[in-house]
Design a protein with these regions (language model features):
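Extracellular beta-sheet repeat scaffolds used for adhesion and glycan interaction
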Residues: 101-124
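N-terminal small/polar-rich segments of proteins
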Residues: 21-88, 116-156
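N-terminal signal peptide c-region/cleavage motif recognized by signal peptidases
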Residues: 17-19
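Charged, amphipathic alpha-helical segments and their flanking helix caps
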Residues: 89-93, 101
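Bacterial N-terminal signal peptides that target proteins for export
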Residues: 1-9
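Intrinsic disorder/low-complexity segments enriched in polar/charged and small flexible residues
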Residues: 10-11, 108
Length: 156
């Protein structure tokens, strides 16, 4: 049996934009990993999991709102079409999605991918977003622990 896990690392991009009334001076990002558990290659249904990305910003000003964008990179696969978790030369395909229907690939807005967009205000400077993970059925990897690292970029 394979034990796939997905590690997260947050990267903060300081691309400052905003309205004249509210200003984001900084944001912090944290994320929980998407752990698929033990993968059984004989099961004919996909494996699902989820995680969370949380963003907390320092917003000054009495009114207004600022757009925040969360983007993911491709990880080890180099493509948003299908990400891969690796164990030496073996791999497991998976992907990350914005929606529970698993139709909107979470990425950087290029190719088949979309980004997560949210507004922050002085009254609501923080938010969390669910990351939906799906691993297709009937893959035949070797045994071991499979991992991938996704860089999370928060732009404001």
């Amino acid at each position: 049996m394979s034990r796939p896990t997905l590690a997260w690392y947050g990267a903060l991009a300081l691309l400052a934009t905003g309205s004249a009334h509210a200003l984001v001076s900084s944001c912090t990002v944290s994320a929980s990993g998407v752990a698929f558990g033990v993968y059984d290659p004989t099961v004919a249904t996909a494996t699902f999991s989820s995680g969370t990305v949380s963003v907390s910003c320092v917003v000054s000003g009495a009114t207004g709102h600022n757009p925040i964008t969360i983007a993911f990179d491709t990880g080890s696969s180099g493509t948003f079409t299908s990400r891969t978790m690796l164990n030496a030369t073996d791999f497991l395909n998976y992907n990350l999605y914005l929606d529970a229907a698993y139709t909107q690939v979470w990425g950087d807005g290029t190719g088949v991918s979309l980004t997560y967009n949210q507004f922050v205000t002085p009254g609501k400077p923080s938010f969390s977003a669910t990351v939906y993970g799906m691993m297709p059925a009937l893959q035949t990897p070797g045994s071991g622990t499979f991992t991938d690292t996704i860089t999370v970029t928060v732009s404001f």
